[in-house]
Structure formats: C-alpha cells, structure tokens
Design a protein with these regions (language model features):
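Cleavable N-terminal targeting peptides that direct proteins into the secretory/outer-membrane pathway or into
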Residues: 1-31
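Acidic, small-polar-rich N-terminal luminal/periplasmic segments of exported/outer-membrane proteins
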Residues: 31-168
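Short polar catalytic/cofactor-binding loops
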Residues: 42-46, 181-182, 236, 252
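Short acidic/His/Gly/Ser-rich catalytic and metal-binding motifs that mark active-site loops
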Residues: 49-50, 168, 211-214, 343-346
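Short structured motifs
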Residues: 80-84, 188, 304-305, 318
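A short glycine/small-residue-enriched secondary-structure motif
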Residues: 93, 113-115, 207, 348-356
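Outer-membrane beta-barrel translocator/receptor signature
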Residues: 111-113, 125, 134-143, 148-218, ...
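Outer-membrane beta-barrel domain signature, strongest for Gram-negative TonB-dependent receptors
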Residues: 221, 227-357
Length: 357
C-alpha cells in the first residue's frame, strides 16, 4: 500500500512539472515573438542585429523616442564604453571616444577617429556633429575598427544615423513639443507628402532654445551655455523605374549660442584672466577646485567678455543617391554628398580668484 501511494504521488508531481514547463515555454515563445527586431546596416546590407558578428549598439527610432533621445549628445547614456563631450568653443562640435580611443580636438584641420554617417553620407569634420534627432529610422554605433567597409577615420568605430525616407502614396505628419529646465522649449515637426504615383516629399523641421547655465559676472555679455538651434531637412524620393530609385536630400543646421567651460572655475571675487606669466603657478593651485566645479549639478559663475561675438555654426548639406536593384538581394548604389559650413568658435578658459593665492 505504501509503495502504491508513493508511486501515485511521484506520478502527480511529474504531471504537474510537465504542465508548468509547457506553460513556461509558451510564455517564453510569446515574449520572444513580441520583441521588436532591430535591423542594422553594419555590413552594408540589412540584417538583424542578432546575426551581425560585430560589437554594435543599435536602436530603432521608437527606441530613441521612448528613451527621450533628442540630440546626438544624448546617445552616450545608451552605449557602454562611449563618451561624447561638447567642444568648449562650439556646442555643435563633439569629442567622441569609444573604448577609450577617439577625438580630442574639434578643429577643422583634424580628422575624426570615429566616423559619423548620416543617410550613408560621411561627415568629414566634427562641426555640426551634435545635431538634433527627429524622425529617425535607426541609429547604430559600431565599436572597433571599421575601415574595411567605412573607410578611414574609423579607428575606434562608426556612428550610423538613418532618417526615415519619403513614403510614396501615403500622407503622414507628426508634431512633438518639449519643455524643460532652464527655459527649454523645443518643437519638431514632420510632413510626408505624396506627389505622384512614384514620388514623395518628406520635410522635417526642428527648433530648440534653452537658457544658459553659467552666470556671466561681467554684467554686459550673455550667460554661458545658451542653446539656439534650428534644423531643416527635405527629402525627395522618385522611383524612376521599378528597379531604379533616386533620393535627393537638402538639409541645414544652424546653431548659435554661447560657449561652455573649457576649464571650470567658480569666481567669488574679481577675476584674473588666465594666460599671463603666472599661468603655470595659478593652474597648479586650482586644479582640484576646477575638477570639483565641473560637476554639472553645480551652479556656475564666471567672467567672460564676449564682445567679440558668440559661437555659431551654419551647416548646409546636400545628398544625391541612386539605388539600382540588381535582383538576388543585391543592389548597386551611387552616393554623392556635399557639405559647407561657416562657424565661429569662442571658449571660456580657466581664470583665477585673486584671494585664493
């Protein structure tokens, strides 16, 4: 009787575990099926990110919206081992590092170590690399050397930004309004217009303004860190034949404002401008303070005579792309792009508090 009871008990336990495993498997399968597949072009072809043997961080446009990513600088919060810093002279210029390697100079005469591609067009200089993001299809960060497929300036990696393309035969529009700290006000809009049965136009506009976060003690010039950006993008897509597509894009990015700290220092009394004979002695004494005062949560004060003008950037870009479908999952693409920029970069350097020395 005892053996029969034990066998019945074991049989009941086995049936219960089997049902539990089946339910867990079904739940897991549903979870996997519901996951959004992220497509990457890291190898110059569309593939699932899970099939690419490259260290890559890829995000869809929906991912960026849900995470509140509105500017290229924001992606540093999503990508491990990646650092993006603003240039002290112009807030649209970025210093980008991946895995500890990257660019530390934002001047026009220096090449990047990390390439930035926007709609397959290479940005040859860092000016304008901290642009605002809206109506983006996907963003990818490739880590490690990528010279085989993306040419030079990819010693540390590459950043690929692909915007949404015009959709033929469909009208669509969207508007996004954002407000935040320091008087932040941003408005972004998109309109997709079907022109004919084989052509469409997609227009995107962005404006973003924000007050500065550095109180200027000279009393005459603007505070530091002011943001005033305007972006515009128009893309025309024409299906010339069933196999041949023409894409033309015209974009502009205007960024004006005031510089941010090159070296941080809080002034409590009359400032002494850096650069004099005692600069070496002065900077030794204030190194620790400068590091502490660069904490973004602090309240900055400084002295900066900006009578020579604020920072600005006017960047105009054009893109022409012809894509021919060869069949058998193969395409032939011709891409031609131009970029013209006019900018002025002014920065604030470390000063000294006379009472401290």
């Amino acid at each position: 009787m005892l053996n029969k009871f034990n066998l019945n008990k074991l049989f009941f336990i086995a049936i219960t575990l089997s049902i539990f495993n089946l339910q867990a498997q079904d739940s897991s399968d549903e979870s996997i099926d519901s996951m959004e597949e992220v497509i990457t072009t890291a190898r110059r072809t569309e593939e699932s990110v899970s099939d690419v043997p490259i260290a890559i961080s890829a995000f869809s446009g929906t991912d960026l919206d849900e995470k509140g990513i509105t500017n290229m600088e924001d992606i540093r919060s999503l990508v491990p081992n990646m650092l993006i810093q603003k240039s002290a002279g112009n807030q649209s210029v970025a210093y980008v590092s991946v895995r500890g390697m990257g660019s530390q100079r934002g001047s026009v005469q220096y090449d990047n170590k990390i390439a930035i591609y926007v709609d397959d067009a290479f940005m040859i200089r860092p000016q304008g690399s901290l642009f605002d993001l809206f109506d983006v299809n996907n963003l990818q960060v490739l880590k490690g050397p990528q010279g085989t497929l993306f040419g030079k300036n990819t010693t540390s990696g590459a950043i690929l930004v692909n915007n949404n393309l015009p959709v033929v035969g469909e009208f669509d529009s969207s508007v996004k309004v954002s407000v935040g700290l320091r008087g932040l006000a941003s408005v972004s809009g998109m309109v997709n217009l079907p022109l004919t049965s084989n052509a469409a136009l997609r227009v995107v506009g962005i404006t973003k303004k924000q007050d500065g976060y550095i109180d200027n003690l000279d009393g005459f010039s603007d505070d530091g860190g002011i943001i005033d950006n305007e972006s515009f993008r128009a893309m025309l897509s024409v299906d010339i034949t069933e196999d041949l597509n023409l894409l033309y894009s015209q974009s502009m990015f205007d960024s004006s404002g005031t510089a941010v700290y090159a070296n941080c220092e809080v002034y409590t009394n009359s400032p002494m401008l850096a650069g004099g004979p005692a600069l070496g002695v002065v900077t030794q004494g204030m190194k620790t303070r400068a590091v502490n005062d660069c904490n973004e949560t602090g309240h900055y004060q400084s002295y900066h005579d900006a009578t020579f003008g604020d920072s600005y950037l006017d960047l105009d870009k054009t893109l022409l792309k012809l894509t021919y479908d060869l069949g058998s999952n193969s395409t032939l693409t011709f891409t031609h792009s131009t970029a013209k920029h006019d900018d002025q970069e002014t920065g604030w350097a470390t000063g000294a508090n006379r009472t401290e020395f």
